[in-house]
Design a protein with these regions (language model features):
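Helix-coil-helix junctions within alpha-helical repeat/solenoid scaffolds
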Residues: 1-201
Length: 202
């Protein structure tokens, strides 16, 4: 189906709508369309300062672009530089969000912790992701807590006991919220053999 041309539109609603579409396509395994929509979302974000109401776009664009970049890095794909650039732009938007409102802080910390994990910077990844968990708890943001526990669990392949605890917590919180997507992700991670992140210098 044809989708709306957002090229002349302005405002947070545009970036948010594009980010939602990008995530939907990623979940449907249409990575090419997910990337195209995410890049459009980044353009929409760049039209002005990051505002509070842009938090869905900031969060979802990171959630789409970071795994695409990680897969490209693992597969030595030709478009890895493009995906890296897009993912880091999304993370910078998340950081801007975290600088202007508290709810952006766990989003930013989780994004940059994931970047560090992708680059093989384990200590930095663990610190940022642990801070994301703490901030989500402090702000009473259970959905962010579940996602931060998932991200930290992914970053702890060499600590199976703590990894399992975090993933079980993510599953419990997600189930309580009725969020089957994150509950299923936690279950999948609990049943797979953890692997170390791709080593790469920044």
């Amino acid at each position: 189906t044809a989708r709306k041309d957002f090229s002349r539109d302005r405002g947070s609603a545009v970036a948010n709508a594009l980010a939602v579409e990008a995530m939907a396509n990623l979940l449907l395994a249409d990575r090419k369309e997910a990337l195209a929509l995410a890049e459009e979302g980044l353009v929409a974000l760049a039209r002005g300062p990051v505002l509070f109401q842009m938090w869905p776009a900031c969060e979802l664009l990171c959630a789409v672009l970071l795994p695409l970049w990680q897969d490209a890095l693992t597969q030595h794909a030709d478009n890895e530089p493009r995906l890296r650039s897009a993912a880091l732009r999304a993370c910078r938007a998340a950081r801007s969000l975290g600088n202007i409102c508290p709810i952006g802080q766990p989003i930013s910390l989780r994004a940059w912790g994931t970047v560090a994990n992708i680059l093989g910077q384990s200590r930095r990844a663990h610190k940022r992701l642990e801070e994301a968990v703490v901030h989500a708890e402090r702000l009473k943001m259970p959905l962010e807590l579940a996602q931060s526990c998932l991200a930290l669990g992914r970053a702890l392949p060499d600590d199976p006991e703590r990894r399992a605890h975090l993933l079980q917590r993510a599953h419990h919180v997600s189930t309580e919220l009725g969020c089957s997507l994150f509950a299923e992700q936690a279950t999948a991670l609990l049943t797979e053999t953890p692997s170390s992140p791709t080593q790469r210098k920044p």
